[in-house]
Every structure is written in structure tokens, then in C-alpha cells.
Amino acid sequence: MVAMPSGESARSPGADGAAREPAASGSALFHDGNRALQDRFDGRRVADTLEARRRAAAFAPEHVALIEAAPFFFLATAAEGAVDCSFKGGPPGFVRVTGPAELEFPDYDGNSMYLSLGNILKSPSIGMLFIAFDGRSLRLRLRGQASLVEDPVRIAAIPGARRLVRVAVTDIFPNCPRYIPDLAGSAPSAYLPRPDGSQRAPEWKGRDYIRDILPRDDPHRV
């Protein structure tokens, strides 16, 4: 495991290691489509605060622990209108954090369609989702720029690897754990809507920097 400094930032490094500047939307995380819905449903204040408070520029120790203990993650890729979401599994530790905002994972024997890797060759922007379904309610979303590594020596050091995928991570975002079921305990999320439509409030909505800026129609607004 690579120990990384903790801390939060409103800016993240790009694929070349340089900090990514905000786009025309005034955000490095949100585009105009996100902004349109935030404004329509009175969510911009919350979105901006979460970006500033929760989006990180480098992995914190808890991020590294979740990633390197994960037996699987979900990978999203897209190119030329072909959008794909793939399950990637392996022994815990098969995803390795290799830098403050960089990781690698092996590509194992598959079905020869190369849907994910083919998309990466055409468009390196990817999304990764790590979730713990064991009752801890942990979720981590990553965005980054992926590239294929075909160094025979490095590949030979990882049992079963056909090649490696390196990801320069641009967005590290620990996401709200609501709705994640406890599969180990066969228990549904405690935050699912009740028969009367009410829901338990998540902890984050009560934080001092969030509770007073919730959208006007938020069911947990005080």
C-alpha cells in the first residue's frame, strides 16, 4: 500500500500532472448540463460546496485502503457513441495505487471483444466506481485518463495479467453512501424510501456547511 497525504482541494491534477482549471461552467467537475439541472432544481449551492469540500487532488489514506482492498470495481468508458460499463474483478490488491493521483490494474483474459480497452484507445477518459457492500457503506468515484501498459517484464510480475491499465486520476470524489445494501448481512440500505415516501436523512446533510444551503424542496431541509 502506498501511503498518501490526506487533504481536500477544489482542483485536481490533469493527465500531465498539472492542476486542471475550471471550465466555462466555473467548475472543473461540472459541465453546462450539470449546471442546467443544478439551477433548475436549486442545487448549485450544494454542488459547489461539495466540490470545494469533498473533491480531492490526491488520494487520502482511506481512499488507498478502499482501493487496494477491493476485490472488484466498475469501469465506465465511452468512444464514438459506444458507452460501456464493465465489472472488473481480481484478488484484493489487484488495483494498486502508484502515485498521489495515479493507479494501475491488470487486464486479465477476457472475451476478445475489448470493449473497455478499445474505448480507451479511442478516448482515454474513464470513470471508476469502488463500493464496499459489506455494511461499511463506502463509495469512491474516480475520473481519469487511462493508457495501456504492455511492458513484458512488468506484466510477467502480475499473475494472469495480459496487460496493465494505468490511470492518471483527475477527480477523486468520496460519494454519499446512501442506498448501498449490506450484502454480507443480507440487509437493504436503511436510507431507502419508506412506504409513506419519507426517508432517513443522511449524515452529510446535517453538516454545518451543507444544512443551510439545501435546495428549497429538499425533504430534509430544516
Predicted regions and their residues:
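Binding-site signature for planar aromatic cofactors or substrates
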Residues: 1-222
